[in-house]
Amino acid sequence: MHHIRRGAGKPLLLVHGLGGSWRSWNPILDALAATREVIAVDLPGHGRTPPLDGEVSIDALADALTKFLAGQNLTGVDAVGSSMGARLVLELARRGGTLGAVVSLDPGGFWRGWERHFFYGSLYASIRLVRRLQPVMPFIAGNAAARTLLLPQLSARPWKLSPQLVLDEMRSFAASPSFDELLHQLAYGATQPGVPPGAITRPLVIGWGRRDRVCLPRQAKRALALFPDARLHWFEHCGHFPHWDVPHETTRLILDTTAQS
């Protein structure tokens, strides 16, 4: 599994979301690496990591990530996940024995009824648009008004995002060979199972953007019901990616939570 390491100190794993890569974490990477050794992965079928053989699912990705951590002597590492990656770190926390402290940022898998269709349909349309727009993506990424028109579902303040961050992310979305299959699995596959109270003994925080238009804020209550040992942190004025919209607050939450482990 391709990954980058930056900084020195206690290891900290970063797991990106659907279509992303390790570069998704660039807004907070250096701040975290100032005090931690950051390991940011490209999940299978993303970035420079080839796709999995066979079915592509949350369970399969969780198995692959567990194997990677064991191979890197990182079992028990503190971890942060975003979106699909947030669901992955919750799943590994549920299984037990793989991760230390966990911060799960706007996790998927807690939708019901029409929310599944909204999630699938909106991202299905978005990825097709992003693929069509690749020839002009450098212009879109570099123009604040164009970024705002393209990314309102992902960010509460697209005009403030780094053009390079947006270009990297949109290139990664378009290039991921596993995007379509994972999108369908996330929307219509198995829902995220939970754990009984007291099952998770390491620090666990679920963070949610108040303006998330991918994983709707109403789903946070369901996530807490399934992971009753978790603490919920709300990010105000924030969309689906807290590390994009409120990087300083996100960095502080991560460092404070993982310092307890």
Feature names for model-found ranges:
Residues 4-50:
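Conserved HGGG/HGGXW glycine-rich cap/lid loop of the alpha/beta-hydrolase fold
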Residues 60-77:
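Conserved acidic catalytic loop of the alpha/beta-hydrolase fold
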Residues 81, 85, 89:
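Gly/Ala-rich beta-loop-alpha elbow adjacent to hydrolase catalytic centers
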Residues 102-134:
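Flexible "cap/lid" loop of the alpha/beta hydrolase fold
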Residues 138-198:
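Conserved alpha/beta-hydrolase catalytic His-Asp/Glu region
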Residues 200, 206-208:
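Short beta-strand/loop motif that positions the catalytic acidic residue
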Residues 210-215:
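Acidic catalytic loop of the alpha/beta-hydrolase fold
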Residues 238-251:
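Catalytic histidine-centered segment of alpha/beta-hydrolase-like enzymes
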